[in-house]
Amino acid sequence: MIIGIGVDIIEIERVRQAIQNNKNFLSKLFTEREIDYFISRNMNSEVIAGNFAAKEAVSKALGTGIRGFSFKDIEILRNELGKPEVILHNGANLIGNKLVENNNSLRVHLSISHNNSSAIAYSVLEGEYYGNM
């Protein structure tokens, strides 16, 4: 059963400027594994903006926005084929588990795309709905 959807779009230039103007931008919002991935992609602003939009989309699908947890609690990684995968930690994981009957049944689907100016992410949460939020 679908229990949440979220979408976010961001201007890539805003992310590029944030990286240039704030030396702590990446470390405040992204985990070490995410930053390692960015480095492997030559710190590509489109990739970083896509991950940022993905975190926002997942937070909206959880129904809370970024309340009760930090951006680092939503980790966006890639599998061996490059497909984005979501790992929820700490507060985000607690909120996600409150939505489903069985803590292991929450599945987070994610799609990320970008063009020259914007990055967009769409997230769908799936599981056995518990509805105790």
Swiss-Prot record:
It comes from the Bacteria. Mg(2+) binds at D8, E56. It is found in: Cytoplasm. It is an enzyme of class 2 (transferase). SUPFAM superfamilies: 4'-phosphopantetheinyl transferase (SSF56214). Pfam families: ACPS (PF01648). GO terms for biological process: fatty acid biosynthetic process. Coiled coil: none annotated. GO terms for cellular component: cytoplasm. Belongs to the P-Pant transferase superfamily. AcpS family. Transfers the 4'-phosphopantetheine moiety from coenzyme A to a Ser of acyl-carrier-protein. This is Holo-[acyl-carrier-protein] synthase. It comes from Clostridium perfringens (strain ATCC 13124 / DSM 756 / JCM 1290 / NCIMB 6125 / NCTC 8237 / Type A).
